[in-house]
Amino acid sequence: MGDIRKIVFEENKLEKKLCRLVGQAICDFGMIEDGDKVMVCVSGGKDSYAMLDLLMKLRERAPINFEIVAVNLDQKQPNFPTNILPNYLKSLDIQYHIEEQDTYSIVKRVIPDGKTTCGLCSRLRRGILYRVADELGATKIALGHHRDDILETLMLNMFYAGKLKGMPPKLRSDDGKHIVIRPLAYVPEKLLERYSADMNFPIIPCDLCGSQPNLQRQVMKEMLRDWEKKHPGRVENLFRSMHHIVPSHLMDGEAFDFKNLEISSELSGIAARSSGDRAIDEADLDELACGTLIQGTYNPPL
């Protein structure tokens, strides 16, 4: 009996932590507003299932009113079980829509065997989801990318594209007509793995990206997990650095006007928080060495 109580306690503790992280991200970035209709994109993977579940829980206790409509894009992948998602969504008693579009055949026809399919697949999906959002009258489009996805994107851009660029928690589409949000932006993947197992979500594997083990993104994922094991706090601080950008100590002339930099007796704005001549903030390093700076799971600023 004691073991069962302990399991239930741990499950409730995890759910509360996830709700807090998702709620914090929503507040920090103004993701959801009163009267919004949020189109929650559900792929059949652990992340999107968890996102839908957590948004439904938060909606019950939120001080604002917003609608949820779950949307799945059936890309006609071989062996895709067409009944699992409709049955699951129907059991939740929420509005949902299944969009059937054979993007799988297009991707397989255009991309040679052995080449990465993610780029074309994501572009096709994006266009379809934008259209569906218009048809459903959705004001926000929620995607299930989590903290680790954001860090992997940051490192991919740094290592392979030479850009200091990540994956934003909230963005406006290129056509200016849609707002995309990522409510799981603060959530580490390992917590979603635990939550998915606890909730027993009916996971559906992807026969496109899920069958490409040598992707560079997978290399980044393994690197992050190795860091978490060998260097506690490193991944959390890497993520924290995305919240504390100091353009004056980088090299982008568009982000900081180096050419017109002059001697001044007063500092304001970015210059005031640039730490002047210091490239390394020793106080933070001292705290980290003492084990007092961001240990364990990332906690966003309150």
Swiss-Prot record:
One of the Pfam families matching this protein, by short name: ATP_bind_3
CDD domains associated with the record: TtcA-like
InterPro entries referenced in this protein's UniProt entry, alphabetically: Rossmann-like_a/b/a_fold, TilS/TtcA_N, tRNA_Cyd_32_2_STrfase, tRNA_thiolation_TtcA_Ctu1
Pathway: tRNA modification
Record's keyword terms, sorted: 4Fe-4S, ATP-binding, Cytoplasm, Iron, Iron-sulfur, Magnesium, Metal-binding, Nucleotide-binding, RNA-binding, Transferase, tRNA processing, tRNA-binding
Gene Ontology MF terms: 4 iron, 4 sulfur cluster binding; ATP binding; magnesium ion binding; sulfurtransferase activity; tRNA binding
Localization annotation: Cytoplasm
Binding site for [4Fe-4S] cluster: C118, C121, C209
Substrates-to-products reaction catalysed: cytidine(32) in tRNA + S-sulfanyl-L-cysteinyl-[cysteine desulfurase] + AH2 + ATP = 2-thiocytidine(32) in tRNA + L-cysteinyl-[cysteine desulfurase] + A + AMP + diphosphate + H(+)
Intervals of motif PP-loop motif: 43-48
GO terms for cellular component: cytoplasm
Cofactor: Mg(2+); [4Fe-4S] cluster
Its biological purpose: Catalyzes the ATP-dependent 2-thiolation of cytidine in position 32 of tRNA, to form 2-thiocytidine (s(2)C32). The sulfur atoms are provided by the cysteine/cysteine desulfurase (IscS) system.
Assembly notes: Homodimer.
Family: Belongs to the TtcA family.
Protein name per UniProt: tRNA-cytidine(32) 2-sulfurtransferase
Organism expressing this protein natively: Polynucleobacter necessarius subsp. necessarius (strain STIR1)
Native organism taxonomy: Bacteria, Pseudomonadati, Pseudomonadota, Betaproteobacteria, Burkholderiales
